[in-house]
């Protein structure tokens, strides 16, 4: 996967989400370590979104809810629905959650992120159709809005989910 700068490239930085209904759009999150990129794509509406979550939980009234899975998932899903996506027909995929950082007593942020995401999706009646979570390597991901391809690039490989 070559991620070249173009007018159709939309980048989700840490704590950000990007959404598009343009079939020319490519949604990208660079340098995922313990963070998680969640890609959601509706094949009928041709709407895609990518959220770049940093931590499993955060303050209930923070200025950047998408930084945290517990406060950011609902705004992300609502934004997709406002663009015409129907969650029941969406492909939901994720990557990241590598073992890059530990906090305090050795609680792995990546593992906690993966667990929090899967639990939050389950609470909403949703599940991942595919994922590349864990390990100890960083990743860059790209969602092609035209066809829903979710590409994951690491130092050693490029895979498609």
Question: Over which residues does each language-model region extend?
Answer:
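Active-site microenvironment for binding and transforming phosphate-containing groups
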Residues: 1-161
